[in-house]
Amino acid sequence: MKLRIISTKWLILILIFVAVCVAALSAFLSSKIDRDLIISYLESEKNIRVDIEDVSPSLILGEVNIGGIIIGPRDSYADKGLVAEQRSKPVPSKTRIKISNVSLKVRLVDLFLDKLSIKSIIIEDLDLAYSINEDGDHSLDSLLDPPKYIKGVLNPEYERKKKRRELAKIRWKLDSGLKNPDDDSFNASEVPMPTTLDELIIKGGRVAIKLDKSGNNVYFSKVKGSITDLDVDPQNLKEHNSALLGLEGNLKVMGSESNLEYASFDLKADGIIQPFEASSGFLNPDLITSLTVMEGSKIVSLPIATRLASTLEQLESTGLDLSVIDDLLVVDNDTTFSLGLRNYILRAVEPLPVLINGNQIILEKNSWLNTANDEHLINASFTFSDKISQKAFEKSYEYLSERVGKGVASAVSELLFTPVTKKGKIHIPFVSSGDFNRPKVRPSVELKDLADAIKEGIKKDPLSILKGLLDR
């Protein structure tokens, strides 16, 4: 009993001693981990200027809070490595990353095992802005370059890293089609040790993208996102290279004039992704995710729809209502599909059906859109609702009866609508290509000219035209 009491006393003394040591070490590290240290580290890695308002580390909790972060183009202050107090405020830039606060929690014990285990990264109020030119190059690209100067001294790694990135860009431009080589901006080998991340959460944010060629603007607002269960081992990417993605927000496409709105989509994305390509270690250039377009999302102006409507004037003249194509297009219900993204090229991984205004649009597999220069190739079909289709058939018969008589009306109507009828509904397969804002659209089936259809109808039964005239 006495031995147990003595042991307990010793244990308490040891725990007190450990607590004092941890507190002392925490105080020491807290004094070392400040904003200048973090700024210096980041500016030594990339071609950026970093501004931070405050840093609050806690060794006991394994937590660091970083507030008021601004990342933008590099300037002379960053090149010289001056401390924050010696710098003037950053010049406002259209290319920027601003974050109100980042909270980072790690498992300190795992660091002694050469493993980085991150419990959570919480990003609050993200503000990201950049532009994309017609070649697919974005204004963030230069920020990912290695810095030429670090603390006023020429970076010995600059030429090697710069050349590696330039070679990757040349390979990217020389390759043709959709199969572009890997982006050399980041490699898994730059991850210092096997890394796991329980969760990365974005609490509110917005992204603004300027498309230089068209002058259009893309805004992603009300952003909520998460990456969970990240598992990356740079030495074993075949088995440790995955993460679970979750993202939602409103995507709005605006014209060069700020009041011109093309579309507004409420989106959700989720699924398992591979951050790196296993063979090369570079960022995976071909991300595939499950995307849901929410009910009520709308397309205010769609050039493809307008051009498609112009090719159907013969059918419109006989009774087909094309206003459902030209009017405001509203998504009828939540629609989920797989979408691939490779070097700013969006493609349908599988057929993409969407119900709009009671009608169905289906984009065929491998249809694609280059979001950088608006080039596209889309194979699709537009199927009118049963109500509109039946009304078109009835109006067509009435119109043709007045024009050529009832005896020929049915035959002519059949000649006009048979090529574009599927399962009792008017079904228009079509192809769209070229500039998305000025597309070349053509139906994939041959449409009958009204005059030719009337001639063919009369040939089938010459006497019917006379009978039709007598019936009037």
Question: Which residue ranges define each predicted feature?
Answer:
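N-terminal type II signal-anchor transmembrane helix
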Residues: 1-46, 51
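Extended lipid/amphipathic-ligand handling interfaces
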Residues: 42, 52-59, 87, 99-116, ...
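N-terminal leader/targeting pre-sequences
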Residues: 47-77
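Secondary-structure transition motifs
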Residues: 68-228, 297-324, 441-449, 457, ...
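Short regulatory "switch" loops immediately downstream of catalytic or recognition motifs
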Residues: 69-82, 131, 230-232, 251-253, ...
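Flexible, solvent-exposed coil segments and beta strand-coil junctions
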Residues: 84, 185, 245-252, 315, ...
